[in-house]
Amino acid sequence: MRRLLTLTTLLAGVPLAAPVCAEQVFSFQRAAGQLPKTVVPVSYGINISTDIDNLKLTGQETIQVDVRTPTEDVTLNQAGLHLAGAVLDNGVKATITQDDAAETATLHFPAKVSKGAHTLVITYSGPILKTPNGIYVDDYTAPSGETKRMLVTQFEVADARRMFPGWDEPAFKATFQLNVTLPKEAVAVSNMPVTQSTPEGTSQKRVSFATTPRMSTYLLALVAGDMKSVQGQADGTPLAVYAPSGLEEQGEYALHASEKILPYYNNYFGVKYPLPQMDMVAIPGNYQAGAMENWGLLTYIDNVLLFDPPNSTPRTRELIYEVVAHEMAHQWSGDLVTMGWWDNIWLNEGFASWM
C-alpha cells in the first residue's frame, strides 16, 4: 500500500499530455484474438507419449467445449502437428483442414454442432524440438561428465500449440489434466502434483498429474529428466527446487528465498497462493526464456537459480533473489489474473518487476 501511495503521489506531480483513460472492464467477447469465440474450451485431458531418442510425440486429447453459437466449423491452434482424427460426442467425425501458415486447424462437421456442452476427441502426432520452444529436449553435460537429455516445455508466447491442439490465446482459459508417457528413470514435474505413476512396458512409465485451476494455455508446463530436489514449505504450501542430479544442493538459497517471499505475497495480495505446491526447476543451458512463471512450476536457466558458495559471487545471490521474487509475483499478476491479449504483457512484466 505504501508503494502504491508513493507512486500515486509522484505521478500526481507529472504533467500529462493527454487525459488518462482507463481500459474497459474485461469482456471475453471483446478480447483481442485471432480465433473465433463460437466454441470455447472448458477442460483439456491431454495424453502424450514421448520418444525422446527419436524426437517424436503422439497424443490424444479429450476437450470439453462450450458451443456458444451453433456452427459446422471449429477452429483451434496447432503448429507443426499432424491431426489424424477428430470426433465429436458419439462418434461424429470431422474433416480436418490444417493451415500451417496461420498455425490453425479447422474441424468441419457434417451438420451444425448445437449450442451447449460437447466432447471433442483429437488424435495427433508431432515432433519434439531441439530449439527451446514448445516441447523440446535439452542436452547438457551432467556433473559426472555424462551427456544427459532433459525434456522441457516453454509455451510463452504462443507455443503450447506445438505440444497439443488447442485454443492457444490467453483469454481462452480452461483446466488441464496432463498424462505423459516417458522413460521410467525420469523424474517428471508439472503444474500440479503427481497423482499416479504406472509402468508402461519395460522401459517407460505413465505419469498422471492432478487437474489445474482454470488458466491460459501458455502457463502449462512439463519438465522431465535426471533431477533431484531440495524441499521446504511456507504458509502451508510445499516448496521445492529441482536441479540436475548432483546440483540439487545449490538450490538451497533459492528455496530459502521462496520461503520468505511467499508469505509476503500472500499478505500483500490478500489472496493466498491457490495451488497445492510450488516447484522451481533449474534448466541447464538451453533455455532462452531466462525464467518463466508457469503456474506452480517456475522454470529458470540454471545460472539464475543455483548458488554454488565456493564459486558464486554476492551479485549472483542478489540476482537469484530478484528473479525468484519476479517469477513468484507472476503467480498472481499474470497467472491468477491474466491479460486478455499479448499487447498488455508489459503490465504483467512491469508489475512483477515493480514488486
Swiss-Prot record:
<feature type="binding site">
    <location>
        <begin position="290"/>
        <end position="294"/>
    </location>
    <ligand>
        <name>substrate</name>
    </ligand>
</feature>
<feature type="binding site">
    <location>
        <position position="349"/>
    </location>
    <ligand>
        <name>Zn(2+)</name>
    </ligand>
</feature>
<feature type="binding site">
    <location>
        <position position="156"/>
    </location>
    <ligand>
        <name>substrate</name>
    </ligand>
</feature>
<dbReference type="InterPro" id="IPR027268">
    <property type="entry name" value="Peptidase_M4/M1_CTD_sf"/>
</dbReference>
<keyword id="KW-0963">Cytoplasm</keyword>
<dbReference type="GO" id="GO:0070006">
    <property type="term" value="F:metalloaminopeptidase activity"/>
</dbReference>
<dbReference type="InterPro" id="IPR001930">
    <property type="entry name" value="Peptidase_M1"/>
</dbReference>
<dbReference type="GO" id="GO:0016285">
    <property type="term" value="F:alanyl aminopeptidase activity"/>
</dbReference>
<comment type="function">
    <text>Aminopeptidase N is involved in the degradation of intracellular peptides generated by protein breakdown during normal growth as well as in response to nutrient starvation.</text>
</comment>
<dbReference type="Pfam" id="PF17900">
    <property type="entry name" value="Peptidase_M1_N"/>
</dbReference>
<feature type="binding site">
    <location>
        <position position="326"/>
    </location>
    <ligand>
        <name>Zn(2+)</name>
    </ligand>
</feature>
<dbReference type="GO" id="GO:0016020">
    <property type="term" value="C:membrane"/>
</dbReference>
<keyword id="KW-0482">Metalloprotease</keyword>
<keyword id="KW-0862">Zinc</keyword>
<dbReference type="GO" id="GO:0042277">
    <property type="term" value="F:peptide binding"/>
</dbReference>
<feature type="binding site">
    <location>
        <position position="330"/>
    </location>
    <ligand>
        <name>Zn(2+)</name>
    </ligand>
</feature>
<keyword id="KW-0645">Protease</keyword>
<dbReference type="GO" id="GO:0006508">
    <property type="term" value="P:proteolysis"/>
</dbReference>
<keyword id="KW-0031">Aminopeptidase</keyword>
<keyword id="KW-0378">Hydrolase</keyword>
<dbReference type="GO" id="GO:0008270">
    <property type="term" value="F:zinc ion binding"/>
</dbReference>
<dbReference type="InterPro" id="IPR045357">
    <property type="entry name" value="Aminopeptidase_N-like_N"/>
</dbReference>
<dbReference type="InterPro" id="IPR014782">
    <property type="entry name" value="Peptidase_M1_dom"/>
</dbReference>
<dbReference type="GO" id="GO:0005615">
    <property type="term" value="C:extracellular space"/>
</dbReference>
<dbReference type="InterPro" id="IPR050344">
    <property type="entry name" value="Peptidase_M1_aminopeptidases"/>
</dbReference>
<protein>
    <recommendedName>
        <fullName>Aminopeptidase N</fullName>
        <ecNumber>3.4.11.2</ecNumber>
    </recommendedName>
</protein>
<comment type="similarity">
    <text>Belongs to the peptidase M1 family.</text>
</comment>
<dbReference type="InterPro" id="IPR034016">
    <property type="entry name" value="M1_APN-typ"/>
</dbReference>
<dbReference type="GO" id="GO:0043171">
    <property type="term" value="P:peptide catabolic process"/>
</dbReference>
<dbReference type="InterPro" id="IPR042097">
    <property type="entry name" value="Aminopeptidase_N-like_N_sf"/>
</dbReference>
<feature type="binding site">
    <location>
        <position position="349"/>
    </location>
    <ligand>
        <name>substrate</name>
    </ligand>
</feature>
<feature type="active site" description="Proton acceptor">
    <location>
        <position position="327"/>
    </location>
</feature>
<dbReference type="Pfam" id="PF01433">
    <property type="entry name" value="Peptidase_M1"/>
</dbReference>
<dbReference type="GO" id="GO:0005737">
    <property type="term" value="C:cytoplasm"/>
</dbReference>
<keyword id="KW-0479">Metal-binding</keyword>
